[in-house]
Structures are given as structure tokens and as C-alpha cells.
A protein has these predicted regions:
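A short, charged
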Residues: 236-242
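A broadly tuned, weak detector of single residues within folded domains
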Residues: 11, 44-45, 84, 175, ...
């Protein structure tokens, strides 16, 4: 609430209390979090706070902005979509982030999930195979003041070994099988959240402990297919998005 002091005749002053301007998108965002995320079982207060703060309408095309706070995926161009908010929150919560972690994201898309991760982790490295999306997301994140996320245009199948190991890995497209390089780049006690499958997909949480891995399926999902599984072919070094 803002306060305004107005001068009156005779040297007196009048103190008025004024409500701050209503931010309609903030209201919609808060309503989305309460109705579509918290009410469906997401409990981590840091995740809920990040979902309230990251403006989804700035990560979708202008024609889709009016639908930004509906709990559904939206097209972002190049045949790709931005995930529904509940799935973003659910996958993020599965990483158990405390703010000290280094996270790898495969599939930057518009950068929305990247921004949510950046609000919760120390550093986020994100790979997008489509150069045009990588460039747009990188510019968008910089414009919005997000300084702890780095986006590259590359094939995510090989991960980003230069910055491994990662405390968390989050994959936003579904391969038929879990890419071995991503398993190798997961830190001890690290967690990977990844949709796996073809027509029928399951969201899996992989946890590394010592030399072994545990795997559990947590949710049936439907993601776009993983593109660029280049196993057995030379893999170019990641190129920073511009």
C-alpha cells in the first residue's frame, strides 16, 4: 500500500493511503498457483514462490499471452510447446533444490522452465537443439535480468560434460531410452527428472548413489519427442547462443 501526503490550507497536511496499482498478470499467476499447482499437491514453498514470481506470459508468443496462466501447454513455434505450469512445478519439485545446486536442463524451449530453475538453483546450464529457440531464450533471459542461466545451441543427448557433474538434470523432451551420457554426468546423490517412452511415456526420477542408480516412475506424461539422439556420431562442442 502506497501513502501520499497532500498539502492543505494553513500549513496542514493530509495523509492518504492508496492501494498500489493492480497487476492483473500477478493476480492470474497467484490464482494459477493456488488452483492448479498447490491444490494438486505441490508443497515445496520455494517451488510455489518461484511459480508465483516467474511471469509465464513473457515466455509465450504474444498471440498466446492471454492463455499464459491456463494450466496447459502452449505452442511456442518450431513445432515445440511450453509445458503446462503444473508439470513444470512437479518436475522442479522432484529435483529437491535448495539453492546450492548446479543444474543441467535439456530442452530450453522458450526459457520458462529455465527461469524457474534459475530462481531455485545456483547455476543452470540449458541446451536447446534448435538454434532459433536457443537464441530467443538466451536473449529473453538476459532481458529479464536472469544472470545465473546459460543457454547453448547443441544436441542435448551428450549433455554438457565441461560443466559436469550436475546435482540435478531436468529433461523436457522424451527419448525412447535414458541417454547414457546424462547418467554419467549426474553427480553422486544427484537427481534426474526425465520423461521416457514413445506413444506411452512415464516421467522417471533417477537418483545416483555411489556407482549405482535407482529409478522410479512417478507420473504418466506426454512430451514432445527427444530430438538429436546422436549416439555413435561425432558430437560438436556446444556453441553459446547469441
Amino acid at each position: 500500500m502506497a501513502r501520499v501526503i497532500l498539502p492543505l490550507v494553513g500549513g496542514a497536511w493530509l495523509l492518504l493511503a492508496c492501494e498500489r496499482p493492480v497487476d492483473v498478470t500477478e493476480q492470474k499467476r497467484n490464482a494459477m498457483v493456488e488452483k492448479d499447482i498447490a491444490a494438486r499437491g505441490i508443497k515445496d514453498p520455494r517451488v510455489l514462490d518461484a511459480m508465483r514470481r516467474v511471469p509465464r506470459h513473457l515466455y509465450v508468443p504474444p498471440a498466446q499471452a492471454e492463455h499464459a496462466y491456463e494450466d496447459r501447454p502452449l505452442p511456442i513455434g518450431s513445432g515445440q510447446t511450453i509445458s503446462q505450469p503444473y508439470i513444470v512445478a512437479f518436475m522442479t519439485e522432484q529435483l529437491h533444490l535448495t539453492g546450492k545446486e548446479t543444474v543441467l536442463e535439456i530442452g530450453t524451449g522458450s526459457g520458462y522452465q529455465t527461469a524457474v530453475l534459475a530462481a531455485l538453483a545456483r547455476k543452470v546450464y540449458s541446451i536447446e537443439i534448435r538454434p532459433e529457440l536457443a537464441a530467443e531464450a538466451s536473449e529473453r533471459l538476459k532481458r529479464l535480468g536472469i544472470t545465473n542461466a546459460e543457454v547453448v545451441a547443441a544436441d542435448g543427448y551428450r549433455g554438457w560434460p565441461e560443466h559436469a557433474p550436475f546435482d540435478g538434470i531436468l529433461v523436457t523432451a522424451a527419448p525412447e531410452k535414458i541417454p547414457p551420457p546424462l547418467l554419467e554426468q549426474l553427480a553422486d546423490r544427484g537427481r534426474m527428472v526425465i520423461p521416457v517412452g514413445g506413444f506411452y511415456q512415464e516421467l522417471k526420477v533417477i537418483e545416483r548413489s555411489g556407482g549405482g542408480y535407482t529409478e522410479k516412475s512417478v507420473l504418466p506424461v506426454r512430451f514432445v519427442p527427444f530430438v538429436g539422439e546422436a549416439e555413435g556420431t561425432p558430437f560438436p562442442a556446444p556453441t553459446p547462443a547469441r
